[in-house]
Amino acid sequence: MMEQLRKKEQHIAKVVGECSTQGAVSVSFSTVQLAKGTCLEKLRPWMLRYRCSSRTGYAEWLADRAGAQSVRMAELLELYWDLIAVVEARFAVVPSEVEEERFYRRFQAHVVRRVGRRITCTARGRACAEDKYPDFQQIGDMYGAVGDEQGVHLYKWVQSSRRLLVLMDERAAGRVDLKRWLVMMMELVDGARMLRGCQALQVYVSREDLVNVKDLLKNLNWIGGELVQNVGDRWSDDEAMVWSDERYVVIRFDC
């Protein structure tokens, strides 16, 4: 991984970790919050905690307005752009002959340009050129991270297909209680108002994570998942970047 992205991951883990000292927490934001002129109050993230509800007696995602105050406003823009960069970099193909620093600058400019296009289309209520790409290649309408005792799992919401794409923390190899983790993520989809209308949870697990890949594939029928065929390499319209989902085993769960 490029050093620039490693630092961004560390920043995300630090901020989310400070919010998740007691159980799991979800920190997310809408891409349109990055529009120029957005006031600081509207930059606040959506925060949910996975905890026992006095209403039901079971763990569920509950809004945490007090917790949102603990994320300093000065960090929010940096956190949001870091989340976008790290999620999109997971699917970007780095040419072996290109120097890392030069590639990163090109990648960063490319992503910023496409985020701007997504914001403009959303603000004007019109279809976006992004929508023709496969889900993993699209700039998301929302980005977020779930922090728990097993790591920081990243996600993005693709409105055009109504799918939530989740990247399991690659550092959590072999340590995830898959049943509990999947229930928690499905309940995030069910309980988060900004994800209403979600039709599928699409989980991306690194092929190098042999333990979790094996467990997921072995229990596909039991957990109600469907193995999704990889799309492979896809160029962007300007042919500046190549995206690919080949690094991952992709499993879809209907919501």
UniProtKB/Swiss-Prot annotation:
One of its GO terms (biological process) is viral translational frameshifting. Pfam families: ODC_AZ. It comes from the Eukaryota. GO terms for molecular function: ornithine decarboxylase inhibitor activity. Coiled coil: none annotated. Ornithine decarboxylase (ODC) antizyme protein that negatively regulates ODC activity and intracellular polyamine biosynthesis in response to increased intracellular polyamine levels. Binds to ODC monomers, inhibiting the assembly of the functional ODC homodimer, and targets the monomers for ubiquitin-independent proteolytic destruction by the 26S proteasome. Belongs to the ODC antizyme family. Interacts with ODC and thereby sterically blocks ODC homodimerization. This is Ornithine decarboxylase antizyme. It comes from Eremothecium gossypii (strain ATCC 10895 / CBS 109.51 / FGSC 9923 / NRRL Y-1056). The gene is OAZ1.
